[in-house]
Structure formats: structure tokens, C-alpha cells
Amino acid sequence: KLGKFRDAREELHKKDEPYRRAANSDFIIYLLTLMAVAICIRTFIFEPVQCIGDSMYPTLMNGEGMFTEKLTYAVCEPQHGDIIICRYPYHTEKCVKRVIAVPGDRISISDGAISLNGEKLDESAYWSGYIEDSEMPEVTVPERSLFVVGDNRNHSGDSRHVGFIPYCQVKGKVRAVMTPFSQARWI
């Protein structure tokens, strides 16, 4: 009896072979499509980024995972106060900084404070300290460039040290903190 059962099972498998192959190839196509969509979303729309260091304290803490959106700056320019992910010229690592000045703005640092277009910048929402050892004569931000700083002014390598950030080095706008989940919030 076992031989007849085995023969019947093999016959059934032979009949189902084309259907199983089609189902397997459909599944593989589905997985490849899903992977391509995920790669496109990460490359062109959203990207998770981790905050490394304390340069954005207290707004962002070291180790927090952020949600970065990339489409905004494809249709509009960065604005004062935006928190962005960028690369410094001649550097490969990404960093997170706040936009302080946009093209055409005049910026200077004196007496421990930043002045924008001749007026002391109101930074009370994210900075309440005194900028130590940082005097900078007035400069004008060139076209298609930004002046960025970390919220933790005295512990941040930023435009005061590396110069203006060209638009082409802006990688996205920080929209939210995702991790740790207990600290999740919109920016």
C-alpha cells in the first residue's frame, strides 16, 4: 500500500510542478519589488539618522534616532531655524545642525551672541548661554549656501569653523526623533 501512496503522491507533485514554479517566481518578483521600493524610499524620501555627539544638546541628545525627510528641499529652500542633516565641504560624515542664516543674510558673533542682519538673534527657544571664545566679523551668506550651528554652541564644530554649507551638501530636514521611543517627538 505504501508504494501506491508514494506513486500517487509523486504523480500529484508532477502535475503541480508548473504551478509551484510560477508561485515561487511570483514570490521572488514580489520580494525584489518590495526591496526596490524600500531602497527608493530611503534614498529619495526618508532616511533614519542617529545623532552623534552633544553639539545639538538640549534639542537632540547623543544617540537619539531621527527621522529625516529629503523631499522638502527639492521644492523649497532651507529656512531660519530648520534642523538639517548636512555634510561639511571636504568631509564624508553627516552632521545635524540648525540653520541660522540663509543666502543674503549678514551674520556676526560678538559679546557672546549671534547677530543676524544687524540685530541680536533671539535664540531663547533653543539656546540660553553665552558663546565662549567665538568672535566673528560680519559676513554675508553667499547664494545657495547656509550658515549652520549646533544648539550647544560651545561644543559644536559648525559654520564658525568650516564655513558656509552649500545647498548641495544639505541631505534632508529632521522631522522627528524616533528613538528611544520614550523620547519620541516631532521637531
Model-derived features: positions:
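Protein maturation boundaries and topogenic segments
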Residues: 1-94, 165-187
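Extracellular/periplasmic catalytic domains that process cell-envelope and extracellular macromolecules
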Residues: 59, 107-108, 139-142
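Acidic loop->beta-strand submotif enriched in PP2C/PPM serine/threonine phosphatases
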Residues: 127-144
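Short beta-strand-centered aromatic/proline hotspots
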Residues: 96-100
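Phosphate/adenylate-binding glycine loop and adjacent helical scaffold
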Residues: 150
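Active-site loop architecture of trypsin-fold serine endopeptidases
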Residues: 154-161
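Short strand-turn-strand beta-turns centered on an Asx-Gly dipeptide
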Residues: 110, 116-118
